[in-house]
Amino acid sequence: MIVAEFFENGGEIKGFKINGHAGYDDYGKDIACASVSSAVQMTVNAITDVFGFEADVSAQNNTVFFKTASGDIVLQKLYKAFIMQLELLSQEFNETIKIKFT
């Protein structure tokens, strides 16, 4: 299962950690994992490269960690769009993606 953990502080999303494997299909054929990976890459690139927000980012051993300091409204909307995409993927690929907030 892929676990998407979003970090909240004062009602704002400050980052996320994504880890695990969907187990929807064999490694290299898992479209659920590929879909989540694509959504993560697009979100990270939009936040850092397109909108220019600074972030702490690391990716290793099936885990992506991403954290920002800004509470900018644009950043919050980008996080919300990412959460919405993960929710849609969770509905499409039942029992493969869990979303939680801490």
What are these regions (language model features)?
Residues A32-V36:
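Short, conserved glycine- and acidic-residue-centered signature motifs
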Residues M1-I31, Q41, N45-T102:
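N-terminal intrinsically disordered, cationic/polar leader segments
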